[in-house]
Amino acid sequence: MAGKNQSQKKKKSTAPMGNGQPVNQLCQLLGAMIKSQRQQPRGGQAKKKKPEKPHFPLAAEDDIRHHLTQTERSLCLQSIQTAFNQGAGTASLSSSGKVSFQVEFMLPVAHTVRLIRVTSTSASQGAS
């Protein structure tokens, strides 16, 4: 009887590790993880994609939206929404059913200065 208890204890101590999952399942999982990592390009080898620059197909050529950075676009949208929600600007409805909303706001000085420089250089390049 004593021999039987010892062999049972040995079987328990050699039980698969990994929170009760059989070793086979753990190996399959590890293999799948390695396979998926091989399919993904490594950090140093991958070409970093630039975020796609939004285009404004309905905007005129001289529209400043073509020159806005992502931060500036976000600031503009936030300012427009805040102005609308607080009742700033002018909102109207035409007889044809078109809604119009017009508002003026200022961006932070650094962004304004950058936009003035960018738009003035593009305007002077267009003139020459």
UniProtKB/Swiss-Prot annotation:
GO terms for cellular component: host cell cytoplasm; host cell nucleus; ribonucleoprotein complex; viral nucleocapsid. InterPro entries: Arte_nucleocap (IPR002484), Nucleocapsid_C (IPR037179). Pfam families: Arteri_nucleo. Keywords: Host cytoplasm, Host nucleus, Host-virus interaction, Inhibition of host innate immune response by virus, Inhibition of host IRF3 by virus, Inhibition of host RLR pathway by virus, Ribonucleoprotein, RNA-binding, Viral immunoevasion, Viral nucleoprotein, Virion. It comes from the Viruses. GO terms for biological process: symbiont-mediated suppression of host cytoplasmic pattern recognition receptor signaling pathway via inhibition of IRF3 activity. The keyword Chaperone does not apply. GO terms for molecular function: RNA binding. Homooligomer. Interacts with host PABPC1 (via C-terminus). Interacts with host HIC; this interaction may regulate the expression of different cellular genes. Multifunctional protein which associates with itself through both covalent and non-covalent interactions to provide the basis for viral assembly. May play a role in the regulation of cellular gene expression during infection by interacting with host HIC. Plays a role in the inhibition of the dsRNA-mediated IFN induction pathway by inhibiting host IRF3 phosphorylation and nuclear translocation. Belongs to the arteriviridae nucleocapsid family. This is Nucleoprotein. It comes from Porcine reproductive and respiratory syndrome virus (strain Lelystad). The lineage of its organism: Viruses, Riboviria, Orthornavirae, Pisuviricota, Pisoniviricetes. The gene is N.
